[in-house]
């Protein structure tokens, strides 16, 4: 049984989360670069004298230690509210920091978790286990679908995907499940921190229905809690033409993701 919370989570405006992560930098420069708006969103992490609160210091410690965080993004018409979920894991020995927005996109919960629980937290982020491996989906999806999904527009992405699938006369469980809005588009991204900021190391994009999962060849990434320099490549290790799908069993997928969650 997981013992996730060490203390009550810190609730922050999602827009202020990148600024909170930046506070893990050198103390003398951590607050200098924050805009007035970001500082307003982070008022609860500072004491009256301007020092970081004890809770903030505990949450920032794993962020400071982990130079290869993992971000997760998922969009599905099945999700409540905006249809979008976001999560970021900074994995360190003993305790890790999780930043998570699963229900209300404008708010992010930041909490400490036992590091040995992180693989389960990462796995439970996605609601589609894809146990049956019944592969009868298309060979590719429109780039417009990828763009809509990456922007968090679940309804537009759904319409584009369904329209494309309905062009085929072939019956498939994949098309039926998509028609029922039983699909999920998820992106797992491993980052590397450098003095210039965070850079994408490796990313996997997956389109899944309850019966099957497919790796998506994508050239773009959704917005996340981490940003990389504007002159850096947008995505590393993409394979095949954009939009191509590759069958992927649950075992194969977790073999690819396992290195992301090993501290």
Question: In which residue ranges do the predicted regions lie?
Answer:
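Short, surface-exposed polybasic-aromatic patches that bind anionic ligands, especially phosphate groups
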Residues: 1-263
């Amino acid at each position: 049984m997981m013992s996730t919370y060490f203390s009550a989570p810190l609730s922050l405006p999602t827009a202020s989360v990148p600024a909170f992560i930046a506070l893990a930098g050198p103390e003398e420069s951590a607050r200098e670069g924050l805009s007035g708006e970001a500082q307003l969103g982070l008022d609860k992490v500072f004491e009256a004298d301007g020092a970081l609160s004890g809770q903030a210091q505990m949450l920032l410690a794993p962020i400071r230690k982990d130079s290869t965080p993992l971000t997760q993004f998922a969009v599905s018409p099945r999700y409540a509210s905006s249809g979008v979920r976001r999560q970021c894991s900074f994995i360190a020995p003993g305790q890790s920091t999780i930043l998570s927005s699963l229900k209300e996109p404008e708010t992010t919960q930041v909490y400490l978790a036992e590091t040995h629980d992180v693989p389960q937290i990462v796995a439970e982020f996605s609601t589609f286990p894809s146990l049956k491996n019944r592969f009868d989906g298309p060979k590719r999806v429109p780039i417009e679908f990828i763009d809509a999904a990456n922007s968090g527009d679940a309804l537009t992405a759904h319409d584009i995907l369904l329209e494309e699938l309905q062009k085929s006369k072939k019956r498939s469980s994949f098309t039926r499940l998509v028609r029922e809005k039983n699909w999920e588009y998820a992106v797992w991204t491993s980052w590397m921190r450098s003095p210039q900021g965070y850079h994408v190391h490796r990313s996997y994009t997956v389109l899944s229905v309850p019966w099957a999962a497919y790796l998506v060849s994508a050239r773009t990434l959704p917005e996340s809690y981490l940003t990389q320099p504007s002159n850096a490549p947008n995505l590393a290790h993409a394979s095949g033409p954009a939009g191509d799908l590759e069958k992927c069993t649950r075992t194969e997928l977790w073999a690819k993701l396992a290195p992301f969650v090993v501290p």
